[in-house]
Amino acid sequence: MHILNLGAGGFIGSHLTQRLLSEGHSVTAVDLWQEKVEDLLANPRLKFIRQDIREPGWNLDRLVQQADLVIDLIAYANPGLYIRIPLEVFRLNFTENLKIAEACVRHGKRLIQFSTCEVYGRSAASIETANLVDPEDPIHATFSEDRSEFILGPVCKHRWIYASAKQLLERVLHAYGLEHGFRYTIIRPFNFIGPKIDFLLSEREGIPRVFSFFMDALINGGQMKLVDGGTQRRCYTYIDDAIECTYRIVENPRGVCERQIFNIGSPYNEVSIRQMAEMMREIYAEKFAAPGAVLPDIVSVSGDEFYGKGYEDSDRRIPDITKARTLLGWEPKWNFRGLLEATMRYYVMEHRRAQKVEALQ
């Protein structure tokens, strides 16, 4: 197939592009950044286009028309941005992505749309005040694609604009399927992690995602900051597991993925953010730190202090992956410690390589 991969230069997009090429597909990759696919650019089946999709007049229709399949990964997916530039987050995640979907409708092309597990919002236990729900029972935080309610916070907590934009896009895709027979599949990722996930804070300005923030503190010094105590729980999924499931959706055996939504995540890897920080310190001390090295302190800060006013978070979310198991025969393989160590090793090796290059200059 010839596949148009929009957002191919990001974390998920770069790994997916590599897999698509390894399976023999040709790929037109569109992104603002090419650093994460630099090692793939020599492949004759890859065409990389540096493009900001917000610019007027770019050749979206022609690229969609030439493709057999369109994959859309383009998004602002960083809580710091939801707080600082909520309008731009909405415009990119809904308005610009809707243009891509409508181009697919016009030209009769199948679309794989990456959404987010954040559409589920908060768990039922987090808003129940009569003590009728056991907050420790995972059933109250396990989310199903076609049955679970969406529980988002108040409008003044504009952190939820990202989830709202993604949810609205999902609903429009569903409507196009109903009224126009549009062929789409929606993916809701649950906290993918792996090499190339993010930048380290010492390398550039901004607020990276939590793993990269902790990793930077371990490598370069500083505190491992837990937002609101790090009590939030997440189910982490190694990128290799995630890409395997995504590729099965690309293959679409017997058409089982048509107009379906899939959770991709590992329900077995639930940890609190505090537990993650503690395990990263433990692994770093055991595997990577110099003898006698001083490890960073783990400290708690408020969400308002770390991100700014308007921050709120989901307390807990666990994916129900029954659909992926049943329709795709997929099961995640990586446990939490294994995926954490593998990802940390990548960043440590990259840091050491950069140090050697710098020493030679």
What are these regions (language model features)?
Residues 125-141, 171-234, 239-250, 277-284:
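NAD(P)-dependent short-chain dehydrogenase/reductase
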